[in-house]
Amino acid sequence: VIDAALWIAFAMIAMTALTSLAARRMRVPQSILLVVVGAALAFAPRLPAVKLNPELVLLLLLPPLLYYSGVGMSWRGFRKYLRPIMLMAVGCVLFTASVVAAATHWLLHLPWAVGFVLGAVVSPPDAVAPMAIARRLSVPKRILTVLEGEGLVNDATALILFSFAVGAVATGGVSIIGAAETFAIIVIGEIAWGLAIGWSLLHLRAWSKDTEVEMILALLTPFAAFWPPHFLGGSGVLAAVTAGLYTSWHGPKLISPATRLQGFFVWGLAVYLVEGVVFFLTGLQSRLVMEGPDAGEWSRMIGAAIITVVLVVVIRFVWVFAAAYLPTLLSRNNDARRVTPTWQETFLVGFTGIRGVVSLVAALSVPEMVGTEPFPERDLILFVTFCVILVSLVGQGAALPKVIEYLGLDKTGAAEAESAKRNEVTARVAGIRAALDRLKQLMGEGAVARSAANLRRLHEGRLTDFVHTSEGIDAAPVAEAAGIQLQLVAAERASIASQYAAEKLTDEARRRIERELDLEDARIRHAADSAAGNGFGEI
């Protein structure tokens, strides 16, 4: 069994890498192609069915994704847009679950509690796929912030509501007041726990002053934040997100530069792999979902899926437009009109209600038995959830780039990005001038003249490059200089390789020199990209 599991895991990782490469070449969203390929392989003959273990995803795969999203989230942006984020992450989730429960109760005669289970499962959108597309097309920052913030919090709302609904099915009812009190306790408790974990482990990392120990503590942080609240009856989501947000805000002051450099690569690879495997696993579940219903149930299942798909799309649009414009229409304060989003921005937020892994995990977590009886409508919940995920991810996800271009938000975002780039260059110029001022002080204090002169020429050259960029002067000389520098680094690499081959260098010395050359290569590419405005210098 262990051998089979290892082979399956290895095969999934390999297929994730190959499919991601194909998605890049085909210029389609990676998440969509991973789900499609996974679904196709699920029905391939002679291949074993792969059943997703929801506890495995919740305990091992979800915490690092949540924590990493929290670290990448701007705390200033989160605070600035807290109201719309909470309206979407809490209000829209509860509204969607309630309407789905009512509709399925009246149209499909589902018990109220079962309807709320289905509503809670399909209510939280997944921000991974739409965020990747929106960033690539330079959507305005405020939209990205709202979508990202919604994605951080809505999972917690949905999973807590899901646990209440499953409990109501088992017990036959639930107290609304009691549920509200429990919800408040969970929210406050998880935020407090997330802050405690974020503070303690971040300061422990700063105290350790050891890069490897810091990285181990960083990798343990999401699990330390998520697991205790989860096992105590909460969701764990808010705790992991809060720990990430705390690290995002205070990390730059406490994390060493070496750990930060290493963390970029470690976390980037880990999250890339986890996201890919999760979407691939989502596609692989299609066979198990399709084999569940009895032959006579298909018409009812398909009808339920159509109703739910239409509902979740329409409900989100209704909520988004109402939340955006009703407060302005009802407000007597004219200042409120100046912060009202455009209809294009509102439409895009409404359109990005793509469901993903949390919905699938919640559906698979529905127990098979309630006491001695089968859980009512479990197969229907699984089938409908998978249809909602597939239609929203493949349908809305594939159409999202065209919708963004049609609304003209790519042009708005491009202008905003250009303004942000100018601000970045201005900040870089100020930083270099501060370094030059400090260099003059050191020269006055008796610093070695030759070293100071070399450093001064280096910083003045960087200053000239960024001043030219800020003034709109052709950046071609900067790119040309970067190309020459990279050729020099390549020549140095070749020389080191030949000397190592001639046994003039030890392995340890070769690795030290290669690491220095790698850092120099990365610095040159980073600076060239920043000057040219390509992705703000991301490597």
Q: Which residues fall in each region the model found?
A:
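Transmembrane helical cores of multi-pass secondary ion antiporters/exchangers
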Residues: 1-421, 426, 433, 502-504, ...
